[in-house]
Regions:
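Glycoside hydrolase catalytic-domain groove-lining segments
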Residues: 78, 216-276
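Aromatic- and acid-rich polysaccharide-binding/catalytic face
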Residues: 45-48, 111, 198-241, 307-312
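Beta-strand-rich ligand-recognition modules
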Residues: 396-464
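N-terminal carbohydrate-binding/catalytic regions of secreted carbohydrate-active enzymes
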Residues: 16-133, 285, 292-298, 309-312, ...
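A short beta-strand element within beta-rich, extracytoplasmic domains
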Residues: 358-360, 364-399, 434-438
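Active-site groove signature of glycoside hydrolases
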Residues: 128-158, 181-188
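Aromatic-lined carbohydrate-recognition surfaces of secreted/lumenal glycan-active proteins
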Residues: 169-196, 259-275, 301-311
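Substrate-binding cleft of secreted/luminal carbohydrate-active enzymes
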Residues: 2-32, 45-50, 138, 263-359, ...
């Protein structure tokens, strides 16, 4: 079989996906990959850290379940799942189980963490040490920081919140330089050319690695205590073009504050709320926004995070079955989102880099920068059987594979993968050679410090043999 060296390259606009928040539980990456057919650049998970509170480390909605609450953010601290790392933390629990799951499936961790701005340098250092093994991850600390709903904004002034961000960033960079920090704040003040709380957050804009805003084309922020109706007011729907233009204007102002020097710009939460629009206008407005991104020759937006995979309300590709939280009910937006994912503008590239010979050392840097191999597979027509068997040293390999536009995961210990789902919709009508692309993310989800000086940002795996392939084009009988 002919094999080639390959390289993963960034999308023009990366797609990340929210997976778990105050509005829904984390869904494992095997399920999401099977539903969507390809991985994301990153997966955003949301946690909180309020170690001085008497309710800590319980989830606050469970600790205060008998309290009369009429707004999602009225609890003593934010109702995300507790971050159980830090000083004397437990790395066998959350969020680390989720982080390892995400990375094993060839995606980057995007950790959103709301944090008491009064935590000590020692506590920040402990969190930074937690994040060292997880490669090129991103940390979105105290997002929507110019708002007034999260608990951290009620415990400090905006200047103190901004100064805390800078303090956290500087400590993190000394201990975990593999982690990029995302500053997520408001856009331009209405009627102004300055961003919200610009004086307070100017230094943070300069210090951070990545700029970000959150944008909902429509939103029922009264959920789950108020149903959005025509005669009540805790919901909104915005003009899609105005949201796009306003986000771009915020990016340009961030760049001006930074002395004209560019940085990545993200939308860290993006969707239209089906509670306001219903399922069909939700599709129309999301697709409209994506068309604005594609049509803009300035290519200023580095990526966005679709919020989220499974939601207890109507902000999900699936909504949670109220009878069983392990069950998701697919929404029409899921099919539309798959079309966006499969648009070349929004998916990473795979470039061929010349011939290869076994053994080959594969390098996993990130979903936008990794080296793999491709096996040429000659197809007479659409197969009836398309299989791979992983024997010998390959049995324990952790692999992400792509064929005919669809991705597959092989966990350590798995010896068989069925590729036929790649040919259910993408049928082959004439003889064709396709490539089976193989990459090797970290088998444990963590990088290995024994692998060399660049272990913080790269993971290596040597392939000594190829899988045994079975492609047949007629039924057995």
């Amino acid at each position: 079989m002919k094999i080639s060296k390959t390289q993963l390259t960034p999308a023009k606009c990366a797609l990340d996906l929210g997976d778990g928040s105050e509005r829904g539980l984390y869904v494992n990456q095997d399920y999401i990959l099977r539903k969507l057919g390809r991985p994301h650049r990153g997966i955003n998970i949301m946690y909180c850290y309020y170690p001085f509170d008497k309710e800590w480390p319980q989830r606050v909605s469970e600790a205060c379940k008998d309290t009369n609450i009429s707004f999602a953010w009225d609890y003593p601290y934010d109702d995300y799942f507790p971050y159980r790392g830090g000083i004397d933390g437990n790395h066998d629990g959350e969020p680390f189980t989720c982080m390892r799951d995400i990375r094993k499936h060839g995606q980057e961790v995007v950790l959103t963490l709301t944090c008491d701005p009064n935590v000590t340098d020692e506590q920040i250092e402990a969190i930074a040490k937690d994040l060292v093994p997880y490669g090129r991850m991103m940390l979105r600390l105290n997002h929507e920081a110019t708002g007034d709903w999260f608990s951290f904004t009620k415990r400090a002034s905006y200047k103190q919140v901004a100064d805390f961000y800078v303090r956290f960033q500087r400590i993190l960079k000394k201990i975990a330089p593999n982690v990029s920090m995302i500053l997520c704040i408001g856009g331009l003040e209405p009627g102004s050319d300055k961003i919200e709380k610009e004086a307070e957050f100017a230094e943070a804009v300069k210090e951070t690695d990545i700029w970000s805003v959150d944008q909902y084309l429509s939103l029922n922020w009264g959920w789950p205590y108020e149903v959005a109706l025509k005669d009540n007011s805790k919901h909104k729907r915005s003009n899609t073009k105005e949201i796009y233009d306003g986000t771009k204007a915020a990016y340009k102002r961030f760049r001006e504050i930074n002395g004209g020097v560019n940085k990545q710009m993200l939308i860290s939460e993006f969707n239209a709320d089906g509670d306001v629009t219903g399922p069909f206008d939700q599709i129309a407005t999301v697709k409209e926004f994506c068309e604005y991104i594609k049509a803009d020759s300035e290519n200023w937006l580095s990526g966005f995070t679709f919020y989220q995979f499974r939601d207890d309300g109507r902000l999900g590709l699936e909504i949670t079955d109220p009878n069983n939280s392990d069950v998701g009910v697919e929404q029409p937006i899921l099919g539309a989102y798959k079309e966006i994912m499969n648009d070349d503008f929004f998916k990473q590239g795979i470039e061929v880099k010349g011939d290869a010979e076994l053994p080959v050392t594969l390098r996993w840097g990130s979903s936008e920068d990794s080296e793999g191999i491709a096996i040429d597979v000659d197809l007479e027509k659409n197969p009836v059987f398309a299989e791979a068997y992983f024997e010998g040293s390959l049995a324990d390999a952790n692999l992400m594979m792509e064929i005919n536009g669809q991705w597959f995961y092989k966990a350590p210990g798995v010896k068989f993968v069925d590729f036929m789902p790649a040919f259910f919709d993408g049928k082959i009508s004439e003889p064709k050679t396709v490539k089976l692309n193989i990459f090797a993310p970290p088998a444990t989800g963590e990088n290995d410090p024994s692998q060399g000086e660049d272990w913080l940002t790269n993971y290596y795996y040597e392939i000594k043999e190829l899988p045994r392939l079975r492609f047949e084009f007629e039924p057995v009988m």
